[in-house]
């Protein structure tokens, strides 16, 4: 089942001096089970769009179809709990969502809230705390005694513990060390591979190149491109015009070509770049 947005607009504080357009006539369809990246300059509407996926914000006009639900401006709050069981959001600095006395209780809260038994909630919490890499000896600690990176892991375990069909993540690996970042992004890719949809809000174009199947690029609340990573990154002038960076591998490939090494294809990731260099050197295509 696809995720569909039809003529969706959102206006902040309509009719007031503070009125501002958050989303402007968005039309797109996303295939479920994919890893989708939302990109755009600061203020482009990424976080506003993310909050529409589970009706935390409802459109001012237009229609959204997601997880078997239809969301319009007239949609009430009744029944949204089940939608939010299926579609979960993890905000930037998700550690601010922590509130329980212990790590374990905090991660158990989501499953319990959505009908898990006490034993089921505990089992789910322990499973996901292990998956996010938190040590067993920390589960009875207060989450507020942990480091920032550990708190981030606990918060993410909390939204993964009830295994929503669709998870929306706003810069989830920001602030983690390089190894922690790699582990966390691989966790999300594995979650997608298990049959879920992952929607990632990010400024990190390496993550887009490495993990995304599909990209939505926003600017001033408008959808300016919906394409694969290769399509999005093939035009460096377009990227510069819209204040979007290229992946590091693409930038390095451009420097190599400027130095006279002709590379096959369009390498966007480090493995692709390494393969392209090997092929070029093997074929004697460098000058």
Swiss-Prot record:
GO molecular function: ATP binding; ATP hydrolysis activity; ATPase-coupled transmembrane transporter activity
Keywords in alphabetical order: ATP-binding, Cell membrane, Membrane, Nucleotide-binding, Translocase, Transport
Subcellular location: Cell membrane
EC numbers on record: 7.-.-.-
The keyword Transmembrane helix is assigned to this record: no
Membrane topology of this protein: Peripheral membrane protein
An example Gene Ontology CC term for this record: ATP-binding cassette (ABC) transporter complex
Listed SUPFAM superfamilies: P-loop containing nucleoside triphosphate hydrolases (SSF52540)
ABC transporter domain residues: 3-245
UniProt: ATP binding residues: 40-47
A Pfam entry, by short name: ABC_tran
Class of the enzyme per the UniProt entry, highest EC level: translocase
Keyword Nucleotide-binding part of the UniProt annotation: yes
Family from the record: Belongs to the ABC transporter superfamily. Energy-coupling factor EcfA family.
UniProt function note: ATP-binding (A) component of a common energy-coupling factor (ECF) ABC-transporter complex. Unlike classic ABC transporters this ECF transporter provides the energy necessary to transport a number of different substrates.
Subunit relationships: Forms a stable energy-coupling factor (ECF) transporter complex composed of 2 membrane-embedded substrate-binding proteins (S component), 2 ATP-binding proteins (A component) and 2 transmembrane proteins (T component).
Name of the protein described by the UniProt record: Energy-coupling factor transporter ATP-binding protein EcfA2
Organism: Lactobacillus delbrueckii subsp. bulgaricus (strain ATCC 11842 / DSM 20081 / BCRC 10696 / JCM 1002 / NBRC 13953 / NCIMB 11778 / NCTC 12712 / WDCM 00102 / Lb 14)
């Amino acid at each position: 089942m696809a995720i569909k947005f039809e003529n969706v607009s959102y206006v902040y504080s309509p009719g007031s001096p503070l009125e501002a357009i958050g989303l402007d006539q968005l039309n797109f369809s996303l295939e479920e089970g994919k890893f989708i990246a939302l990109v755009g300059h600061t203020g482009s509407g990424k976080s506003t769009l993310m909050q529409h996926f589970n009706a935390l914000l409802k459109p001012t006009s237009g229609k959204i179809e997601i997880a078997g639900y239809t969301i319009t401006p007239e949609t009430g709050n009744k029944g949204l709990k089940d939608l939010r069981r299926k579609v979960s959001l993890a905000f930037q600095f998700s550690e601010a969502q922590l509130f329980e006395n212990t790590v374990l209780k905090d991660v158990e809260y989501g499953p319990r809230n959505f009908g898990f038994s006490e034993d089921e909630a505990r089992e789910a919490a322990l499973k996901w705390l292990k998956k996010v890499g938190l040590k067993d000896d920390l589960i009875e600690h207060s989450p507020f005694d942990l480091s920032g990176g550990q708190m981030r892991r606990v918060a993410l375990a909390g939204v993964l513990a009830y295994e929503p069909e669709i998870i929306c993540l706003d810069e989830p690996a920001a602030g983690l060390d390089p190894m922690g970042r790699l582990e966390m992004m691989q966790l999300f890719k594995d979650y997608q591979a298990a049959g879920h949809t992952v929607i990632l809000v990010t400024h990190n174009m390496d993550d887009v190149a490495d993990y995304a199947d599909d990209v939505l690029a926003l600017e001033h609340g408008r959808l300016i491109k919906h394409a694969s990573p290769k399509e999005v990154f093939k035009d460096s002038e377009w990227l510069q015009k819209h204040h979007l960076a290229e992946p590091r591998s693409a930038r390095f490939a451009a420097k190599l070509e400027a130095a006279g090494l002709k590379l096959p294809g369009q390498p966007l990731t480090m493995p692709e770049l390494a393969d392209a260099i090997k092929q070029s050197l093997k074929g004697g295509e460098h000058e």
